[in-house]
């Protein structure tokens, strides 16, 4: 397996598909990376030589991927929470931030249903 940006890229896949195993690289970006590096997109990862792998590594180094991208996203959310803005409050409460209804639905964000509490006298 080729190791690019700290990720083991699957050998049996085409280069374009294999690069999507890296967090922060999707199909369009992997296509652009292959084009600028001059690597054929239909070539399997196991068939790439060291020179082509090095070109891919250099191109990917120009983007924010993997741990740096995850850290940046979490810092953005933390910044919103520290500001105390509406989106930050919704993140803190674990509710949808983009205006979706929450009276019904929103189960993904809210988690599984809690049992109804009975009133005690």
UniProtKB/Swiss-Prot annotation:
GO terms for cellular component: cytosol; small ribosomal subunit. Keywords: Ribonucleoprotein, Ribosomal protein, RNA-binding, rRNA-binding, tRNA-binding. InterPro entries: Rbsml_uS13_C, Ribosomal_uS13, Ribosomal_uS13-like_H2TH, Ribosomal_uS13_bac-type, Ribosomal_uS13_CS. The keyword tRNA-binding applies. GO terms for biological process: translation. Transmembrane segments: none annotated. GO terms for molecular function: rRNA binding; structural constituent of ribosome; tRNA binding. It holds the Pfam family Ribosomal_S13. Gene3D superfamilies: 1.10.8.50, 30s ribosomal protein s13, domain 2. Residues 92-121 are annotated as: Disordered. Located at the top of the head of the 30S subunit, it contacts several helices of the 16S rRNA. In the 70S ribosome it contacts the 23S rRNA (bridge B1a) and protein L5 of the 50S subunit (bridge B1b), connecting the 2 subunits; these bridges are implicated in subunit movement. Contacts the tRNAs in the A and P-sites. NCBIfam families: uS13_bact. Belongs to the universal ribosomal protein uS13 family. Part of the 30S ribosomal subunit. Forms a loose heterodimer with protein S19. Forms two bridges to the 50S subunit in the 70S ribosome. This is Small ribosomal subunit protein uS13.
